[in-house]
């Protein structure tokens, strides 16, 4: 199983209960039905954004920008589409079959070693969400106590290496724990006591679910525990088209400008973000969704300005992936990151 497939199939399975395979959810969320920008009468440019999975709290900036008309103000009519498979984004953008998509920094770096025609153009969630989460009912009070315990994962090899790095900080190795792939989902495995902890869960999603279920989770974001900082969710675009198609490059700039407005609005008003995502985020109770959205909103903050990505930070993470055997070829971060399309800070 590829790392992207594992990340989607394992981690997101528990989130999408009752959801259908493909969702096109933009039309009713604020895009102009007339196909024109009402402020100036100009025709809107249609574009599609392929999500990484079903609509969920990680996507609040997208849906709030849509609801507030921020994309329309940039001259765009944006459609969000959920993938039929979580490996779709990189492939379809590389082939030019969808203009933009949501992906992850580790997968984008891996795509660079595979020759895929993609580049990251903006960080939507500019910090790591992946966390080691320990059940409060396990009797384990810190990662140091995980020796001899069973830890669940979604099968993503990146997460396994992240766990290795976390354990190293506490003078443990993977050989001292039992790592199992929990096909039934990370949260059910914790609830049933099959595992004492999970890796691959997000601090703003699974940690909230587990707390609501009374497991009193202890949450350790991997980037605070020995893993290099990275951008969890990124916008990816077609690299060749960016270099050769001026209209496409303009569209990407306009999309990022609109998304930046949505991210700022979500941070300023998590209640507004909740109202925007609630109609499309399925499989959550209203109370749980609210807690997730309120936990997610501050994580959108980027001290360098919305969407900003550090090529040096990406290089550090790519080097870590290479040193841990997650990629077999070295990657020049500048080949998979284009940091020049996001709005200038303060604009």
Q: Which positions does each model-derived feature cover?
A:
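Bacterial N-terminal signal peptides that target proteins for export
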Residues: 1-17
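Conserved C-terminal helix/tail region of periplasmic/extracytoplasmic solute-binding proteins
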Residues: 315-347
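C-terminal motif of bacterial Sec signal peptides marking the signal peptidase cleavage site
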Residues: 25-28
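Bacterial signal peptide processing site
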Residues: 30-33
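Secondary-structure end/capping motifs
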Residues: 245-324
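Short, glycine-/small- and polar/acidic-enriched structural segments
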Residues: 36-183, 187-192, 196-204, 219-220
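Hydrophobic helical h-region of N-terminal Sec-dependent signal peptides
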Residues: 18-23
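Pocket-lining segment of extracytoplasmic ligand-binding domains
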Residues: 106, 185-189, 193-281
